[in-house]
Amino acid sequence: VLVATGCSRLIMFNTVVPKDEGARRIVRDAAYAPGPRGRIDLYTPTRPVGAGLRPVIVFLYGGSWNSGTKDGYGFVGRALAARGFLVAIPDYRLVPKVRYPAFVEDGAAAVRWVRAHAAEWGGDPARLVLVGHSAGAYNAAMLAYDPRWLGADRAAIKGFAGLAGPYDFDPFDGPIASAAFQGAGEARATQPVSHVAPGAPPALLATGDKDTTVRPANSDSLAARLTAVGTPATLRRYPAVGHVGILTAIAQPWRGRAPVLDDVAAFAARVTAEPGSPPGMRP
């Protein structure tokens, strides 16, 4: 279902790509859970927040559930923070040391930590948007739509933005998914589409029409299910963009390839807008 992206290549990419002005990392390696993978970074705009609190984005990266490090995604944190958000990027435990649902449980623990500490850094713990790419989009979708993981904290999730995510697939088909979901039991219970219910958070579901790693039909299926229960779901399909390209389009040199950053930032601003805010107002 998914193909891993080399951690070393992403770290190198993150190192050499131009950094967005107007944003900085303010927390590195804070512990949200025990162990070396239970660490989280925070990024914030450099401009003053004023009297209010900023909405918060929690970004979950992909990597087939078996690879990845937050150190390769600073370009995402800075890009979104420069748009006015407090951005959290956690690591999480990986296959083969763990299997489902451990990586979802880690995402839930990270969200709870963010809610407990966001205000210390100018973030609003009641206005969170979950954003994810690939396997991270799956993790984020499960947190957004399956109430088992966040419980009462799910009320703070105002929206979900998934980039090239798998939401409706056979978890026992193929070696990568099988390794991640071995022993999971009922297959449908592992799928985000199975947990959508009335009152679910709105979604932005973005894919590239050249994605051969995670089929765009996953996003179509989730959008249809959300629409059926009355939840707004926006589908974006970028021409000539592949599975990795939808992520790298967030970086400065490649933003002209697809308006991924603009779309995610506009969606997050809209779903977290406070009553009385002018339409389209950025955080």
Annotate each language-model stretch with its function.
Residues 52-63:
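Short beta-strand element of the alpha/beta-hydrolase
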Residues 212-220:
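Conserved alpha/beta-hydrolase "acid-adjacent" motif
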Residues 199, 205-207, 211:
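Short beta-strand/loop motif that positions the catalytic acidic residue
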Residues 220, 227-283:
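C-terminal catalytic histidine-bearing segment of alpha/beta-hydrolase fold enzymes
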Residues 19, 35, 165-195, 201:
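Mobile cap/lid helix-loop segments that gate and shape the active-site cleft of serine hydrolases
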Residues 68-76, 83, 88-125, 252-255:
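Catalytic nucleophile-loop/oxyanion-hole region of alpha/beta-hydrolase
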Residues 8-51:
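N-terminal cap/lid segment of alpha/beta-hydrolase-fold proteins
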Residues 109-175, 187-188:
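Primarily recognizes the serine-hydrolase "nucleophile elbow" in alpha/beta-hydrolase
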